[in-house]
Amino acid sequence: MKIFKFGGASVKDAEGVKNVLHVLNTVGHEDVLLVISAMGKTTNALEVVIKNYFDKSKELHASLQEVRKYHNQILLDLFEDEDHDVFFDVNAHFDDLEYFI
């Protein structure tokens, strides 16, 4: 088994995500375990969202929109067709989170 860990800085943008694919294409897809951290500073950004939630801050929705915008930009850089299912899937998670908060 091959295990690969990609930290947040290594998947902070579309080029980093493409590099993960390159590694998989190089070593193969069988008997591989990937551990991938949150992209870029997403963990920090989500901590801000959570803090805003508990503080009942007026910045709550704006802070969540920043995280959504960041992920959507990466998707736009990776996929030419904005009708690709991945846009729906990722944004559905953000919609669920938005509804929750």
Region locations from a protein language model:
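Nucleotide/pyrophosphate-binding catalytic subdomain
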Residues: M1-I101
